[in-house]
Design a protein with these regions (language model features):
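Alpha-helical packing segments of well-folded alpha/beta enzyme cores
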Residues: 6, 44, 48, 206-209, ...
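Generic alpha-helical segment signature
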Residues: 41, 203, 319-322
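Glycine/tryptophan-enriched, flexible segments
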Residues: 115, 136-298, 408-409, 413-479
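Trp/Phe/Arg-rich N-terminal binding region typifying the photolyase-homology
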Residues: 1-157, 265, 377, 460, ...
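Active-site-proximal binding-pocket segments
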Residues: 230-421, 427
Length: 479
C-alpha cells in the first residue's frame, strides 16, 4: 500500500525519492523452499511496483519503479544508497528482535557513508511509549490498555498519509541500475498452493477482501467462533505485510460502527486489532517474552520431555492426536498456512494442557507455518493459552477439546472438510469417534487405528496432571 509513513516522510522531505525493497537473505535462507509467505511478498512487491509506476505517471514522472535487491539488508541498502548518492534512507519501525538488530546494522552501514536513517511508526496506530499508565508504566492487562487506547484515538491518528500530494518527488531508477521483481525461482523458492487457495498479494486484493468483510462485519462477534463459517476478515496476512494499513482497518471498523449507531461485530473486530497492538507493546517493553514466560515464575513449569513427549509433539504437528477438531485444525494450517483463530486457541491449549508440552514448541511450529505470522501476536497468543502471559487465561482454565468441538463445529462441517475419512460418521459421533460403537464405525467405513487414530491422551487424566504441574509452581512462589 502507498498509505505508508516512510514513503510520505521521504517524499515530503526530499526532491527525489527512489523506492526499494530488499529480499533479505538472512531471513529467506533458513526458510523451506516452498514458503507461502515468500510467494505472497513477491506478489505484493510486483503489485507495489505497478502501483508506483501508475503514481509516477499521474504526476508526469514516467519510469518510476520499485528497485528490488536480494541479499543482506545492511549491505544492499548501504550499497544502493551510495550508488544513488542519497542523503537519507527512510523506513518504518519494527520491534521484532531480529528487525531491531538488522536496522541497527543498516544504520551503522549508512552512518559509515555519512547517510542518515530515519524510521517512523507505521505498523500500529499507537506504539512503544504512546499508551502508558498514569504512572508512566506499560500496561500488562488488556482491558485498561484498550480503554486508554480508545481514549487516545482521534481522527488524526487514523488519517491516511497524503502520499499523492507529494508524489512528484518520485524518481525513476537511473539507467543500468536495474529494477523489476525477481522470479520466485531466482530467489531460490518454488510455487506453493497460494493460487489454488485464492490468496493474492497486493493492496487491490486486500481492498477486495476488506469490502467483502464489511458486508459481513455485523455478524463478526458471533460468526468468528465457528470455523466452518465465513466469519473472520482473512486480512491478517495483508496487515502483517503492509498491503493494507492499520489506519485503514481501524477507520473502517469505526466508521461502520458509527454508521450503524452501534455494531457489536465492528466493535469486536476493533477489539482484536487492539489486542494486536497490546502484544506489540508487550514485545517492546518486555523483550524477554521471546523465549521466556512473560511472568517469570512460569519458567519453572516442568513440561514433559523425552521420547514420549517428542512422539506426542509429532502427532500434534501431523494432526494425528485422535481428537478430530484438533486434527482438522492442524490439517488446515499444514495445507493452507492459515488457522482459524478459535482453533489457534484450541490447538495451543491441547498441546500445553492436554499433552503437557512446552508452549515454545507450538509457538515455533506456528511461526514456521502461518502465512500471517507476527512474532508479537503469535507469542502473545501462545502465552495466553499456556497461562504464562501478561494477561493470560487462568492456569486452571483448561479447554475441553470435545466441548469446544461440539460447541463450535456442532454439525462437524469443519471436521469433515479436513478429515474426509470421518465424513460418514453422524454429527453426534464425529467429535469423538472412539465413543462410536462397532456398528456405527463399520457403517461409516472407519477402522480406528487404521483410518483414524485412537486418542493419544485421556483429557480427564491430562487435566489432573496439568493442574498438578501448575500448582507445583504456584505453591513454590515467593509471597
Amino acid at each position: 500500500s502507498t498509505d505508508q509513513a516512510a514513503l510520505y516522510y521521504a517524499l515530503k522531505a526530499a526532491r527525489r525519492v527512489w523506492c526499494a525493497f530488499v529480499f533479505d537473505r538472512q531471513i529467506l535462507d533458513v526458510l523451506p523452499r516452498a514458503d507461502r509467505r515468500v510467494e505472497f511478498i513477491r506478489q505484493s512487491a510486483e503489485a507495489l511496483d505497478a502501483e508506483l509506476a501508475a503514481l509516477g505517471n499521474r504526476h508526469d514522472t514516467p519510469g518510476v519503479r520499485l528497485i528490488v535487491r536480494h541479499g543482506s539488508a545492511a549491505d544492499e541498502i548501504a550499497a544502493l544508497a551510495s550508488e544513488l548518492h542519497v542523503q537519507a534512507v527512510y523506513a518504518n519501525h519494527d520491534d521484532d528482535p531480529y528487525a531491531l538488530a538488522r536496522d541497527a546494522a543498516v544504520r551503522g552501514a549508512l552512518a559509515d557513508r555519512g547517510i542518515a536513517l530515519h524510521t517512523s511508526k507505521d505498523h500500529v496506530v499507537f506504539e512503544r511509549n504512546e499508551i502508558l499508565t498514569g504512572s508512566g508504566k506499560p500496561y500488562s492487562v488488556f482491558t485498561p490498555y484498550k480503554a486508554a487506547w480508545l481514549k487516545t484515538l482521534d481522527d488524526f491518528s487514523l488519517k491516511a498519509y497524503p502520499v499523492e500530494r507529494y508524489a512528484a518527488a518520485l524518481a525513476a531508477p537511473p539507467p543500468g541500475l536495474g529494477h523489476g521483481v525477481p522470479a520466485l525461482a531466482a530467489l531460490g523458492f518454488v510455487k506453493t498452493n497460494l493460487e489454488a487457495l485464492k490468496v493474492h498479494g497486493g493492496s487491490a486484493a486486500a481492498e477486495a477482501l476488506l469490502d467483502d468483510f464489511l458486508e459481513r462485519i455485523d455478524e463478526y462477534d458471533t460468526a468468528r467462533d465457528f470455523p466452518a463459517v465465513k466469519g473472520p476478515s482473512y486480512l491478517g496476512v495483508h496487515l502483517r505485510f503492509g498491503t493494507l494499513s492499520i489506519r485503514r482497518l481501524v477507520r473502517a471498523a469505526r466508521d461502520h460502527a458509527t454508521a450503524r449507531r452501534s455494531s457489536r461485530g465492528a466493535s469486536a473486530w476493533l477489539s482484536e486489532l487492539i489486542w494486536r497492538e497490546f502484544y506489540q507493546q508487550v514485545l517492546h517493553h518486555l523483550p524477554h517474552v521471546v523465549g521466556h514466560s512473560c511472568r517469570p515464575e512460569y519458567d519453572r513449569v516442568r513440561f514433559e520431555h523425552g521420547k514420549h513427549a517428542d512422539e506426542a509433539f509429532a502427532a500434534w504437528c501431523q494432526g494425528h492426536t485422535g481428537y478430530p477438531l484438533v486434527d482438522a485444525a492442524m490439517a488446515q494450517i499444514n495445507q493452507t498456512g492459515y488457522m482459524h483463530n478459535r482453533l489457534r486457541m484450541v490447538t495451543a491449549s491441547f498441546l500445553v494442557k492436554d499433552l503437557g508440552l512446552d508452549w515454545r514448541r507450538g509457538e515455533a511450529y506456528f511461526a514456521e507455518h502461518l502465512i500471517d505470522y507476527e512474532l508479537a501476536s503469535n507469542n502473545g497468543g501462545w502465552q495466553w493459552a499456556a497461562s504464562t502471559g501478561c494477561d493470560a487465561q487462568p492456569w486452571f482454565r483448561i479447554f475441553n477439546p470435545l466441548t469446544q468441538s461440539r460447541r463450535f463445529d456442532p454439525e462437524g462441517r469443519f471436521i469433515r472438510r479436513y478429515l474426509p475419512q470421518l465424513a460418514r460418521l453422524g454429527d453426534d459421533l464425529i467429535h469423538a469417534p472412539w465413543q462410536a460403537g462397532p456398528i456405527d464405525l463399520e457403517a461409516a467405513g472407519v477402522v480406528l487405528g487404521r483410518d483414524y487414530p485412537q486418542p493419544i491422551v485421556d483429557h480427564t487424566e491430562a487435566r489432573e496432571r496439568t493442574l498438578a504441574r501448575y500448582s507445583a509452581v504456584r505453591s513454590t512462589q515467593p509471597r
